[in-house]
Amino acid sequence: MSEILDLSFLSEMERDLILGVLQRDEELRKADEKRIRRLKNELLEIKRKGAKRGSQHYSDRTCARCQEGLGRLIPKSSTCVGCNHLVCRECRVLESNGSWRCKVCSKEIELKKATGDWFYDQKVNRFDYRTGSEIIRMSLRQKPAVNKRETAGQSLLQQTQMGDIWPGRRIIQEQQQREQSVLFEVPKTRSGKSALEAESESLDSYTADSDSTSRRDSLDKSGLFPEWKKMSAPKSQVEKEIPPGNQNAVCGDEGDMVFKKNTKKVLRPSEYTKSVIDLRPEDVAQESGILGDRSKSVPGLSVDMEEEEEEEEDIDHLVKLHRQKLARGSMQSGSSMSTLGSIMSIYSEAGDFGNISVTGKIAFSLKFEQKTQTLVIHVKECHQLAYADEAKKRSNPYVKTYLLPDKSRQGKRKTSIKRDTINPLYDETFRYEISESLLAQRTLQFSVWHHGRFGRNTFLGEAEVHMDSWKLDKKLDHCLPLHGKISTESSPGLPAHKGELVVSLKYIPASKLPVGGDRKKSKGGEGGELQVWIKEAKNLTAAKSGGTSDSFVKGYLLPMRNKASKRKTPVMKKTLSPHYNHTFVYNGVRLEDLQHMCLELTVWDREPLASNDFLGGVRLGVGTGISNGEVVDWMDSTGEEVSLWQKMRQYPGSWAEGTLQLRSSMVKQKLGV
């Protein structure tokens, strides 16, 4: 019974679907068995025709298959290499290599190939013959076990017993003992249960405890309406808090990084036509109140608040997060640890550059091919770069280029690494496919980095070329001096246009909500409904190599930043002006609460096998920098963002529409207050 799977979490509809698949599998299996029987019958028929009968007399010089005479002179080549019988020319079957076999031997080989007997002959000696469909069918027949509450002592005891036997070693022992024809029994633990059963119960108790803890945390943190003061906690306390059930949990302090994989995938409710999830405390308790991670490519956002992307993490992501955490801890302690370099595009901009005095120049040439609408960049060499390791007089420089404001993964080009030199010679060519009109709005950035150990790269300098000042019909050969980092605020010449987002807002008071609908009572009274209609985006930044983006919009109603407050539109593929036409709905919102709230909308490019790329964002709120009497970074709305939010509050029950410029960074903006 150790092979039985725990399928108690499946619903009735899912069980029916699986049984339907198993039924089709059984039909295909029967059809294949019928084909094999037909081939075996053909082989038996050939053998029957060549069988010698006792009523007849046969000579020694007859064909072993058709019993015809072979004559007096029989050459040695008339013997079959498979069965060593004499065979006439009519009963031979030529093979691809020029040799031949008799009909019976040839048919037997064909039968083994067609039926897979050559594999199953060895499989029977090594494995128990039990198909996956049989195991699933047996598991579905088994009744789900009753959920029993276990004590912490029982859970720890079972985990200790489970750790005594490594699963990989157990499998090796099983295979070795089967080969020696020794009956193998699953080792029993001290509680009288098999190790696999103990492991299963231990896992169940862990997930049950994790689920109950996450529900308690969600109740504590979800007092958004109207009691937010309970959820305001010191930043250090929030950073030390470990969200239970989170896919990547960080245990201990920032220096001691231990990642755990979530052992239980939370089953999501069925999809709605609108993103409707009630935010009242009694409903939030049913959600997983987990503070998620935000996506890795947002400039200016805390690593601790980066959002988990639907259980899609892999080991590369964990390593990146580990390195980012180490670098952030280094900056907080005031040390001069090197930056993360090219681990990710955005995080190349992070780090402490005060310990490196930027020197040197970079030589390059530019050419624009009108026929193919391609910018060709020839990175030639660098002169007199700074030493990344002053003590050892060592630098391993490489050059990275971007067409700003696009700092996506697809927009990055990188040279090879030249080791132990401050005068590297590259002679490498990069190409950007971009139209002439769009190129005039970009700025070409060269940045030079030292490649250090463990991915800790050091910034050595950068230079920019404003493409609107260059005549594209002429080839440009230039040698620019390198300089230190220039912030976006101190360099207004750098283009920061990320596109526009068209949204409509409407607040419906509780008195105007339909009776019997989503209208529910919260502790502070009845709450209304906030509707956010995401209509379209215009002129987004191209994140894909073909000059397009697969974009979607993600929303949070701050100060609550968890899955209960998260909304997402569908992904619009291969367009820079997508029409989303999707509505976010937040229930249980009171009109007076809107003074202390902020709606954050961010646009992302979808990357299936990696972290998503940030394309821009907006924050809609009153823009005072204060929420519920406390200074917060996210209440930084300006201009049209404030006007649209105030218009929505001023006219309840009516749509307020606006076109908002997307921010290039979600760092706190300077407020004119």
From Swiss-Prot:
Gene Ontology biological process terms in this record:
exocytosis; insulin secretion; intracellular protein transport; lysosome localization; multivesicular body sorting pathway; negative regulation of insulin secretion; plasma membrane repair; positive regulation of exocytosis
Name the reported effect of residue 14 to A. Abolishes interaction with RAB27A
> Which Pfam families does the record cross-reference, listed alphabetically?
C2, FYVE_2
Kindly indicate whether the keyword RNA-binding belongs to this entry.
no
Coiled coil feature spans: none
Write out the GO cellular component annotations: endosome; plasma membrane; secretory granule; transport vesicle membrane
Cite the entry's keywords alphabetically: Cytoplasmic vesicle, Membrane, Metal-binding, Phosphoprotein, Repeat, Zinc, Zinc-finger
Q: What is the top-level taxon of the source organism?
A: Eukaryota
Record InterPro entries: C2_dom, C2_domain_sf, FYVE_2, FYVE_Slp4, Rab_BD, SLP-4/5_C2A, SYTL1-5_C2B, Znf_FYVE_PHD
- Zinc finger (FYVE-type) boundaries: 63-105
Question: Where do the record's region annotations for Disordered lie?
Answer: 184-253
- What outcome follows a substitution of residue 18 to A? Abolishes interaction with RAB27A
**Protein name (Swiss-Prot/TrEMBL):** Synaptotagmin-like protein 4
UniProt organism field: Mus musculus (Mouse)
